[in-house]
Amino acid sequence: MAFVSNGTEADEEGFEDAYENIPVASKMDLRCALEECTMALNLFLNNKFSEALELLRPWAKESIYHALGYSTILVMQSAMTFEPQDVQMGITTMKEALQTCQRFRKRNTVVESLSNLVSKQSGDQLTEEEMHAEICYAECLLQKAALTFVQDENMINFIKGGIKIRTSYQIYKECHQMYSLAASQGKMCSDTHYQFEGGVKLGIGAFNLMLSLLPSRVLRLLEFIGFSGNRELGLSQLREGASGSSIRAILCVLTLLFYHTYISLILGTGEANLEEAEALLEPYLKKFPNGSIILFYAARIDILKGRFEQAQETFQKCIVSQQEWKQIHHLCYWELMWCHSFQQDWLQAYRYADLLSKESKWSKATYVFQKAALLSMLPEDVVKTTGEDIVALFRQVESLKQRIAGKSIPTEKFAVRKSRRYISDNPVKLTLPALEMMYVWNGFTIVGKRADLTENVLVTIEKAEVALQNETKVTEYLADDLCLVQLLKGVCLKHLGRLLQAELCFNQVIQSEKRVKYDHYLIPFTFYELGLLYKEQGDRDKAIRYIETAKGNYKDYSLESRLHFRIHAALSSLKGSPVSTPTTPS
């Protein structure tokens, strides 16, 4: 069995040569399994997805790491395609992986043994292989739970998924205790022990980080059944895991990148640590210069820094880097759609939304709404050249709505509600629908990095404002539209540093609260924006008061959960406390 280093000195040609020369192993112990799975991981990151699967397949029912790696790739594929047969394949393979891991676990294992209620098992009661089986079993359980939610909407599956997540969480906590005890006794010194440590840091880090993001009302409920989340603990565990040399180091890196480049923006206030993201990505850009996943994150960081032109080039490079997983192309199309939207190149943005609506199954309702919204920003003569009918597109949206884990997708519900204006024989046009969706996705935080583009967006908003003020035919939507325009205008002014003018816009929305008929979300979101404005002015108490008003005084409005995530992040920052309940694994 050839040893494959996961150091940065190996280039992509080396990985390909090594793969071509590697024989199918005649036996597979833990050390050999880790070496071969490292090879498969390198192939995967180098766009050799099928080769990675083929390397793992022969031992997928005999080795815990081959089982985990093989099933994880298929689960990723199913999550990206959303094809029922792919989801079923992912579930079947993950069941087999769980069975493989179960065979290697110690009987009466860490979580399930009744004796553990009295005394915990320590690491020296388990062999190295049994310790790794626990970690791999926990990872498989998490993925199986996620697929359970996607596959079927019924409550039984939802409960089953929740139980799997809790079991996985408990295993990670017990493994953390085993690792801490063994490390304190100087027993964590072999390479396989370091690999176990990497698994613990990934699991404890990811669980704590993701749980810490949850609004306090949700977290209080989860704490009642044994969950807790501490953001700083989560970040520190992931950083330590990312800086190590275990097979899971790259998984820690990707988790941190996802947090910094997506979660912080969509579910937070947009204060992403891009310097850390760039530092984490740099060695992998050198090691996998054409790796599509690595290129994707490099381009995403460029977007968040306002370097839209550079991001577009990198996304195009990502697209041409591989043709096997088209779903990575779809991720690029989504980002390119926003890149062009930020620059108000509505026609090019529409083209990417059109590609998504035809090729991707992730959220047809969102893609078709985006198409119609983007076309709505264009002159009628330009729309005619596309051959599209805006009204017909909006009318399609409701029929395309889907459910995941028994719940409608919030952005789809929002799109459906907005589209209902077009159901009647005399539809009332939406006002600035593409900019409204940009706000929903926190895109103004990104545009705000570029004063020139923010000024251009402000001009578009002010034109819409004048048109509404001069409207001779008053509709039932007029007050809502005027409030939307003032909210968007205020956000632009805030990013341009014109805080007093922004405050006037926000207050105008709040004063119009009783006149709003449909878009009730505008009021709590405006209170939230005012709170952020006062934070920027240094008025901490006023900022907290306004954000607490958004949190406590409104309910049952569109995108409520998304705002509560952002409120949680903002209040935690203002109050100087960790975004969590500060607990350590126990």
UniProtKB/Swiss-Prot annotation:
The keyword Lipid metabolism applies. Keywords: Lipid metabolism, Repeat, TPR repeat. It comes from the Eukaryota. SUPFAM superfamilies: TPR-like (SSF48452). One of its GO terms (biological process) is lipid metabolic process. TPR repeats lie at residues 292-325, 483-516, 524-557. The keyword Lipid metabolism applies. InterPro entries: Iml2/TPR_39, TPR-like_helical_dom_sf, TPR_rpt. Belongs to the TTC39 family. May be involved in lipid metabolism. This is Tetratricopeptide repeat protein 39B. It comes from Xenopus laevis (African clawed frog).
